Curated annotation (Swiss-Prot):
Name this polypeptide is given: Organic solute transporter alpha-like protein
Transmembrane segments: 45-65, 85-105, 107-127, 178-198, 209-229, 248-265, 288-308
Family per similarity comment: Belongs to the OST-alpha family.
Function, in words: Probable transporter.
Organism in which the protein naturally occurs: Drosophila melanogaster
Record-level GO cellular component terms: membrane; plasma membrane
Length: 328
C-alpha cells in the first residue's frame, strides 16, 4: 500500500485534525516572536535600516528634551520645575520604549505597557502642575470666588449635557483628584496582571484580554474628563499659559501609542510582510508601527517644547516690564 492509498484510507476526522494543526502551526509561526539570538542571526537589510533610523530619532527626541529642560531650569520657579520636567520627559521615554521594541521584539508587550504607563503617570503630574500655576487648590477657590464650572467637556461632552454647573469646593476638588489618581493604581494593576499572563500563558492571555478592555477604557475616560474640567477651570485664571495645548500633547500619548497602535496592529495584517519564522510578519509589522511612533514622538516633543515655553515666556515678559518701570 503506497502513501496515496494510506491517505485515502485514513479516518476523515484525522485528516481534519491534521489540517487544523497545520493551520495552527502556520498562524503561530507568523505571530511568534523570535528570541534575541534568532533575531540577530537572521537580520535583514530592512531591520538594520529600521534600527539605524530608530536610533537617530531617539537621539533627536532626547536632544529636544535636553534643550527644553535647560530652558525650564533657567527660568521656572522650583514648585513648577519638577512637574514640568516630568511632563516633557514622557516623550523621550516613549521613544526609548519604541526603540527597545525594535531591538528586542519579544519585549514588545512590556514596552507597550511603558507607553501606556506614561499617560497614567502624566495625568496626576499634569493636574499637580495645573494647580501649582495658581498656587494650590485653596488659592484657586479664593481667587475665583466660587465661580461655577461646566462639566460637559470632552470626552463626556455629549452625555453630561444634563449635569448642572458646579461650584468648586474642597470636597469636589478632592473627588476630581481621585478621578485622576485612580488611573495609575487601577490601570497599573490591570497591566501588571496582563503582563504576567502574556509571558506565562499566552493562550490564557488571548482568552481573557478582552475582559480587561472595558475597565481600562472607563478608567481613561474618567481621568481624561477630570483633567479637561481642571484645564477649563485654570484657563479662566491663567489663560496665557497654553493649558489646552499642553493637555492635547498629553492626550496624544493615548491616541498615538494606544489607539493608533491597536488599529494599525490589525490593519497591517492585510498586508503580507516578512517571511517565515523567525523574521516573520509580526516582526515587520511591529517595526513599522514603532518607527511611526518614533517619528510622531519627535513632532510631539517639538509641540511640547512650544507649549511649555509658557509660563517661562510670561515670566520673562513680566520681569522685562518691571525693569522698564524701574528705569522710568
Amino acid at each position: 500500500m503506497n502513501a496515496s492509498e494510506n491517505y485515502f484510507t485514513m479516518d476523515p476526522t484525522e485528516n481534519i485534525s491534521q489540517v487544523l494543526d497545520q493551520n495552527r502551526n502556520n498562524t503561530n509561526s507568523l505571530r511568534t516572536h523570535p528570541t534575541v539570538e534568532e533575531y540577530y542571526e537572521n537580520m535583514t537589510a530592512f531591520l538594520s535600516l529600521a534600527i539605524f533610523i530608530a536610533s537617530l530619532l531617539t537621539i533627536l527626541n532626547i536632544s529636544i528634551f535636553a534643550t527644553t529642560v535647560s530652558r525650564l531650569r533657567r527660568h521656572l520657579d522650583k514648585p513648577l520645575l519638577g512637574p514640568s520636567i516630568m511632563m516633557v520627559g514622557l516623550y523621550p521615554i516613549i521613544s526609548v520604549a519604541a526603540l527597545v521594541t525594535i531591538l528586542v521584539p519579544y519585549s514588545w508587550f512590556i514596552c507597550h505597557t511603558v507607553m501606556h504607563v506614561m499617560f497614567m503617570v502624566g495625568g496626576p503630574v499634569f493636574r499637580t502642575l495645573l494647580f501649582r500655576y495658581v498656587g494650590s487648590e485653596q488659592n484657586y477657590v479664593k481667587e475665583t470666588a466660587g465661580e461655577a464650572v461646566q462639566l460637559n467637556t470632552p470626552p463626556c461632552c455629549c452625555c453630561c449635557l444634563c449635569l448642572p454647573m458646579v461650584i468648586p469646593t474642597k470636597a469636589k476638588l478632592c473627588i476630581s483628584r481621585y478621578m485622576v489618581w485612580q488611573m495609575p493604581f487601577w490601570q497599573g494593576s490591570i497591566m501588571l496582571v496582563m503582563n504576567i499572563l502574556y509571558y506565562r500563558d499566552i493562550q490564557l492571555y488571548r482568552q481573557v484580554m478582552f475582559f480587561f478592555i472595558p475597565f481600562i477604557v472607563c478608567s481613561i475616560v474618567l481621568g481624561a474628563w477630570s483633567l479637561q474640567i481642571t484645564v477649563r477651570m485654570i484657563t479662566k485664571v491663567r489663560g496665557d499659559y497654553q493649558l489646552r495645548k499642553k493637555m492635547f500633547c498629553l492626550q496624544l500619548v493615548v491616541m498615538l501609542c494606544k489607539l493608533q497602535y491597536l488599529v494599525l496592529y490589525d490593519q497591517l495584517d492585510g498586508i503580507k510582510m516578512g517571511g517565515e519564522y523567525p523574521i516573520n510578519h509580526t516582526v515587520y509589522k511591529q517595526t513599522i508601527i514603532n518607527i511611526l511612533i518614533l517619528v510622531e514622538m519627535v513632532l510631539v516633543s517639538m509641540m511640547v517644547q512650544s507649549a511649555y515655553r509658557t509660563p517661562v515666556q510670561v515670566q520673562i515678559d513680566e520681569v522685562n516690564k518691571e525693569k522698564e518701570v524701574t528705569r522710568i
